[in-house]
């Protein structure tokens, strides 16, 4: 392990701009529990040993220089603030290459936390929260500070109902009354139009964010929450100001307050001080209604936790392993000595409605039986069993011996499946190859049992299952015939919820109506991509398309083998999916099916799927966020402290002069968009956008120019093509091309 470089505490104190207390924090505070992960580290609840005061401690590793750079802003703001509506800062400590920042603890959580419990907040409660938040903002603005990230998640409440502004990680200091910021920072859904357009802005940007937060408290979510964040960045400056969805249930003064906060022109938008005189804010309700709100939410959470604990206790689980050697009489029937092992896992509910049983047996003849029976229903198709065997077809005597051995080993096993109806067998199950091209989408190969194997193990499986279930005598003959494989071999695998709408990954319109992806013609990397005729309509690529090279791909060693399709193996049957590499684009709503080393089909799409570490590509993709920090000029364009970023951009190899240039040939956005859409009228209507989006298109033009005009190695060509596809997909998402 590498030895960490010693840190000079005095230099660290000078760097942060606040004194570092010399004491060991663990001798002063007792850590109780982790509250979560903050913007730049972990946050813990702690208690002061001497006075018993509860505090929140943010612990940050000093090895992360970016985190230190960002947290310095928060500490400098908090250390200078002393106001009831601002989270109080108590001091900083240094221990084990970690910075401990001690702050005020707010036991009520954030407004967003409350909305997770009660969905919406009443109008009187919203008025109080907005009034207290405006007091905190007015204090900040008078000291020439901007919060820049006001939202429900950064407005905290304590147990007494007091409202505190928190998380000053992106706050900025205004050095004089007339100075304004012009950096792109904040959370997209709460962001003011002037911030997105990178115009000059001041504390009135916080007022806009508070208006969005008021809608968030009233409706549970901010406006446009079902839209992709990058799309929202484009929508906010162009569309009308948001408003409450159902105005009939809210008072006129509340609606007027929101409209004042969400005035598009910042020059006409009132300040925080002016809004403190608004009729909606002049409420006579006491802060005790907020403390009652916090208490009610805590009660609901505690009751919910109690119900969950009771549900877990209702399930009766039993697991036992039994090893038994057959008796002398059983050995006489079989010349070989057989030792049987069985593992049984059962769960029984009192009402008998949810009964699960798993029986696994293994003997010296290497037969394995895995059986899972769901609760008895009128539809027998809901009950299924899987039989896997490694033995040769036994003789009649061996079958009889196997039956008696299984009965002996499982004699004391009791299972709830004894009350279930016999299942009807499926006859003439076809033998299917696990990697057959005709059946690649129908059934996982590991679960396929051939017809002769099913016949071989019917007797053994039946005896194990029926004895484990303690079946009655009227089931003797029926159960021998009822161990079957209930997989539906003729149904393709289907995926649901592939187009679920969420703020992170909404479905985007596509020109494709079939289930297959477009197959592109291979290109030669050495010659680059040729520009298409501008008179010829350009067919848009889908987000799942890849641009392969003519260089043969050999020995691709990955746990999940990827099958590249060409024009010779395309099947027009709608039931067959094309197996293709997964696109890195975030806009795809289509599920890609690929096989693992065992031939089992695996879904890699969908919002809830997670890739295991073993399924990561062998080579790091150029679409990853660069590890190196960007130059100062690039920081002005793609800021690290911006909440919403494009993580796949690799910008270190792009000249700062290129991105910062105002020369027309570097800003010909129309030609870049022409390659993505053939409709000139549509393009001309999309050319009004912020410099931030313009720089994105500049990056696209840069990489396309390299692809078309410079010689590259095959590897460089593939990487550059991938970047072009990623950027093109993002631009098409923003402009809905």
From Swiss-Prot:
Biased composition (Low complexity): 334-345, 401-410, 425-444, 454-473, 510-525, 597-615
Catalytic activity: L-seryl-[protein] + ATP = O-phospho-L-seryl-[protein] + ADP + H(+); L-threonyl-[protein] + ATP = O-phospho-L-threonyl-[protein] + ADP + H(+)
Keywords of the record: ATP-binding, Kinase, Magnesium, Metal-binding, Nucleotide-binding, Serine/threonine-protein kinase, Transferase
Biased composition (Polar residues): 491-503, 529-554, 585-596
Cofactor: Mg(2+)
Binding site for ATP: 35-43, 58
Entry-linked PANTHER family: FI20177P1 (PTHR48012:SF10), STERILE20-LIKE KINASE, ISOFORM B-RELATED (PTHR48012)
Protein name: Serine/threonine-protein kinase dst1
């Amino acid at each position: 392990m590498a030895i960490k470089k010693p840190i000079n505490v005095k230099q660290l104190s000078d760097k942060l701009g606040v004194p570092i207390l010399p004491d060991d924090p663990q001798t002063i505070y007792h850590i109780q529990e982790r509250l979560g992960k903050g913007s730049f580290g972990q946050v813990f609840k702690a208690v002061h040993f001497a006075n018993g005061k509860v505090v929140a401690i943010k612990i940050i590793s000093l090895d992360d220089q970016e985190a230190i750079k960002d947290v310095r802003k928060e500490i400098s703001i908090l250390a200078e603030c002393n106001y009831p509506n601002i989270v109080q800062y108590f001091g900083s400590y240094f221990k084990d290459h970690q910075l401990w920042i001690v702050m005020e603890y707010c036991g009520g959580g954030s407004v967003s936390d409350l909305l997770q419990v009660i969905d919406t907040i009443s109008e009187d409660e919203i008025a109080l929260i907005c009034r207290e938040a405006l007091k905190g903002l007015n204090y900040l603005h008078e000291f020439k500070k901007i919060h820049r990230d006001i939202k429900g998640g950064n407005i905290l409440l304590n147990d007494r109902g007091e409202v505190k502004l928190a998380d000053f990680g992106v706050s900025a200091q205004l050095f004089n009354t007339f100075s304004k910021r012009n950096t792109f920072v904040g959370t997209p859904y709460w962001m003011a139009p002037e911030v997105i357009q990178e115009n000059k802005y001041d504390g009135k940007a916080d007022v806009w964010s508070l208006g969005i937060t008021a809608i968030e408290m009233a409706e549970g979510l901010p406006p446009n929450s079902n839209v992709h964040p990058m799309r929202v960045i484009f929508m906010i400056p162009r569309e009308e100001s948001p408003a409450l969805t159902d105005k009939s249930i809210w008072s006129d003064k509340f609606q007027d307050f929101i409209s004042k906060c969400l005035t598009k022109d910042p020059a006409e938008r009132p300040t925080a001080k002016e809004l403190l005189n608004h009729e909606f804010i002049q409420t006579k309700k006491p802060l005790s209604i907020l403390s009652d709100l916090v208490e009610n939410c805590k009660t609901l959470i505690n009751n919910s936790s109690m119900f969950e604990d009771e549900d877990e206790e209702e399930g009766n689980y039993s697991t036992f392993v039994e090893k038994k050697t057959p008796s002398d009489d059983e050995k006489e029937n079989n010349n070989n000595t057989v030792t049987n092992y069985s593992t049984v896992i059962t769960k029984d509910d009192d009402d008998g409605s949810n009964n699960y049983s798993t029986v696994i047996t293994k003997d010296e003849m290497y037969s394995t039986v895995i059986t899972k029976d769901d609760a008895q229903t009128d539809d027998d198709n809901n009950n299924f069993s899987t039989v896997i065997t490694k033995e040769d077809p036994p003789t009649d005597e061996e079958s009889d011996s196997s039956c008696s051995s299984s009965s002996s080993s499982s004699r004391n096993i009791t299972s709830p499946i004894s009350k279930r109806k016999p299942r009807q067998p499926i006859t003439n199950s076809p033998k299917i190859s696990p990697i057959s091209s005709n059946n690649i989408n129908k059934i996982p190969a590991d679960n396929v049992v051939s017809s002769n194997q099913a016949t071989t193990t019917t007797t053994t499986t039946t005896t194990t299952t029926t004895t484990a279930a303690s079946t009655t005598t009227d089931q003797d003959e029926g159960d021998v015939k009822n161990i079957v494989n209930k997989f539906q071999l003729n149904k393709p695998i289907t995926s649901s919820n592939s187009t679920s709408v969420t703020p992170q990954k909404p479905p985007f319109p596509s020109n494709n109506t079939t289930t297959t992806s477009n197959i592109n013609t291979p290109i030669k990397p050495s010659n680059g991509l040729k520009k298409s005729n501008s008179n010829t309509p350009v067919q848009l690529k889908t987000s799942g398309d890849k641009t392969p090279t003519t260089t043969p791909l050999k020995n691709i060693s990955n746990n999940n083998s990827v099958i590249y399709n060409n024009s010779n193996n395309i099947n027009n049957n709608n039931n067959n999916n094309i197996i293709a590499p997964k696109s890195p684009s975030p806009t795809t709503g289509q599920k890609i099916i690929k096989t693992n080393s065992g031939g089992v089909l695996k879904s890699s799409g969908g919002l809830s799927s997670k890739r295991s570490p073993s399924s990561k590509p062998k080579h790091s993709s150029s679409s990853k966020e660069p590890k190196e920090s960007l130059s100062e000029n690039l920081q002005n364009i793609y800021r690290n402290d911006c909440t919403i970023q494009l993580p796949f951009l690799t910008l270190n190899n792009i000249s700062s002069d290129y991105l910062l240039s105002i020369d027309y040939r570097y800003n010909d956005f129309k030609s870049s968009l022409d390659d993505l859409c053939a409709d000139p009228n549509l393009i001309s209507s999309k050319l009004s956008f912020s410099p931030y989006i313009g720089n994105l298109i500049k990056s696209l033009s840069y990489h396309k120019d390299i692809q078309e005009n410079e010689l590259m190695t095959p590897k460089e060509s593939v990487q550059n093509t991938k970047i072009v596809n990623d950027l093109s997909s993002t631009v098409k998402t923003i402009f809905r091309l």
